[in-house]
Amino acid sequence: MSELKNDRYLRALLRQPVDVTPVWMMRQAGRYLPEYKATRAVAGDFMSLCKNAELACEVTLQPLRRYALDAAILFSDILTIPDAMGLGLYFETGEGPRFSSPVTCRADVEKLPIPDPEQELGYVMNAVRTIRKNLNGEVPLIGFSGSPWTLATYMVEGGSSKAFTKLKKMMYAEPQTLHLMLDKLADSVTLYLNAQIRAGAQSVMIFDTWGGVLTGRDYLEFSLNYMHKIVDGLLRENDGRRVPVTLFTKGGGQWLEAMAATGCDALGLDWTTDLADARRRVGDRVALQGNMDPSMLYASPARIEQEVAGILEGYGHGNGHVFNLGHGIHQDVPPEHAGAFVEAVHRLSRPYHLG
């Protein structure tokens, strides 16, 4: 594969020296870009876009043409694994993802298969290979998966939820059933991410979107425990380079020490966690990614620049910081504001990396 021209994202994840702080945005390929909307219209619907390697590649590359981003992220969805398990993923207009056959009892869990990433999820690997080829070594490609706990929330609730009552009922009334399910999901995610790495992903990220709804004890038992298992099973080197692993629990700022102890390389932070405090707590063990509030991109470019300056100052001098939003970019953000954000990160971070 072609030589990597810009590796500052990978270097920052491994806490190695960089010239400026690298930056990318969660959901950087998305509905805030008019060219994304046009490509999605060609595909017909969201999953058709994910399953067409050429179109998935096109939307992955679109933000890189506009902005000097330091990484590309695979265009896909966290729910590909439950879909491949036969739960019947579909999207309701205005409702988000739904499953036609949610998991309701132990028998449902027992019959869940562990998908073969090169068969049932082969379309994802085709997208990874196509994107990696078309990136031509410009920037690294990030692969990703949802965490077992987060996947379980959708599989048991049948879609998005605010209170997670069905899953929490299973967790408290039938913990062994949930553990069996999470174990299968951890095995599935490990196979899936390793297949992405073999197909060309140069870094991987585990999105634990809903870990923050748990108590501390339950988070360790039902979420972090299974992410730790995945980290232990991942390929950590490919193509002669370390493959960094980032864990991101939204609302998980109180558990950073435990997360860092999993052996991952970096932690994603949402905007509710103070970056300076996070660095004091775990910065000698892992890199940190984040953490501007995505809603800040509605502000003027001057206000965005001010916020970027404050976050850079919070992290301070030295290595080990990847700038990002604290969650995905909103769909109605002006594209030029995202551009002002990326430009400000590079320009304002340079003094923090001198000497």
UniProtKB/Swiss-Prot annotation:
Per the entry, what this protein does is: Catalyzes the decarboxylation of four acetate groups of uroporphyrinogen-III to yield coproporphyrinogen-III.
Main localization of the protein described in the UniProt heading: cytoplasm
A single GO molecular function, which one? uroporphyrinogen decarboxylase activity
Gene3D superfamilies according to UniProt: 3.20.20.210
Q: Name one GO cellular component term.
A: cytosol
Identify the CDD domains for this entry.
URO-D
At the top of the EC hierarchy, this enzyme's class is: lyase
Could you give the subunit structure recorded for this chain? Homodimer.
User: Which terms are listed as keywords in the entry?
Assistant: Cytoplasm, Decarboxylase, Lyase, Porphyrin biosynthesis
Q: Where are the transmembrane segments?
A: none
| Coiled-coil ranges from the UniProt annotation | none
InterPro entries in the cross-refs: UROD/MetE-like_sf, Uroporphyrinogen_deCO2ase_HemE, Uroporphyrinogen_deCOase
Q: Which SUPFAM superfamilies match?
A: UROD/MetE-like
This protein's record includes keyword Oxidoreductase? no
Full protein name: Uroporphyrinogen decarboxylase
Q: Where does substrate bind?
A: R27, Q28, A29, G30, R31, D77, Y154, T209, H327
Q: In which pathway does it act?
A: Porphyrin-containing compound metabolism; protoporphyrin-IX biosynthesis; coproporphyrinogen-III from 5-aminolevulinate: step 4/4
Q: Which reaction does it catalyse?
A: uroporphyrinogen III + 4 H(+) = coproporphyrinogen III + 4 CO2
- List localization entries: Cytoplasm
Gene Ontology annotations of biological process type: protoporphyrinogen IX biosynthetic process from glutamate
- Cite the position(s) of the site with description Transition state stabilizer: D77
Q: Is the keyword Lyase assigned to this protein?
A: yes
UniProt EC number:
4.1.1.37
Stated family: Belongs to the uroporphyrinogen decarboxylase family.
